[in-house]
């Protein structure tokens, strides 16, 4: 609780590996931003610090980073280890996106380790079996000299630096009440120094690129599993939990995961089933957007009502607007199954109608039509979007719905695909909401 006579302001609490550093960073804090995404992207946290004296870059922060890098490198491999190269691409630099060839498999020696890099291991072939010479992914090496090999590579044995943050709006409505937003726990992703003037930007994300569930490629056949069961098993082995919030739980006789990370494979299964996935605060969350869109709007924003600071809207057509979707499948018995879904304002006479064609295994016409509806929604959902910047509001989070009125063709019901909460060093607080128009009627 705050004193009702206190000027409204926002505060943030920050912890590094469980140590409260709020008072340490307060004199340097420029801003703290928490981005909450609805699906297909990790939540992230960004902290900007002024560093005119170089205190953060050359002293305290450098020690923290060095400690983190040292810990993250203790993954069972070390410089000098001879490992089995599995035969994937190699790169000239640890940050390159374009491969420098794809040598065949063979033994190789680790010469440099840059844990956290896009391609963390530099290796050189040892006996001419392979001609690998360059940077490779963790998933492309396995086993040590004298040891066996496995189909998947191990990830980091130690955890990266964890950052936790909470935003508190103090006396925000002049009633003495405080409103807290727990941003969750994140792992250090990058540190950027820029200037002049000196600024340090610390970025942390909920599901780091270097995490095993995201980077380690696996091969496995899943027999007689439900989607929730696959998610639970993947979450458990990666130290996470699962929230399965969809009414329908697809079941698979057999589905193959081949040299694909757990999170990429799970995301593809969700998309194929018309479901959504997000990872946040150590949880894998699977839900049905159609169900969320059907919930009552939490608030209404009307043009000129002064509830917002600014707004923008966009209308996209290319690649985002299909009039119908057809799902078809020919079963082992030669029987053809087909289901078609249409947008709610479908005009059969229109010459501009585009139909999305999907070939997927289904067992009935009803199942085909249900999948067609979900695929149509997946491809059409970003046609109309609106963005509002409001005075700070901890209640405006991803997944909620709201109404926009008085905005012409952009009026209607929206679901929040992203909310960004930003606190300034002086105590200011804003919330930016990006919403996409809901797809009622199909």
Where are these regions (language model features)?
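Assembly/oligomerization scaffold segments
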Residues: 1-78, 146-205, 209
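Short acidic/polar beta-strand-loop edge motifs in secreted extracellular
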Residues: 61-63, 69-71, 210-233, 243-268, ...
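An acidic/polar, Gly/Ser/Thr-rich interaction patch typically located in mid-to-C-terminal regions
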Residues: 32-76, 81-88, 146-157, 308-442
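Beta-loop motif signature
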Residues: 72-114
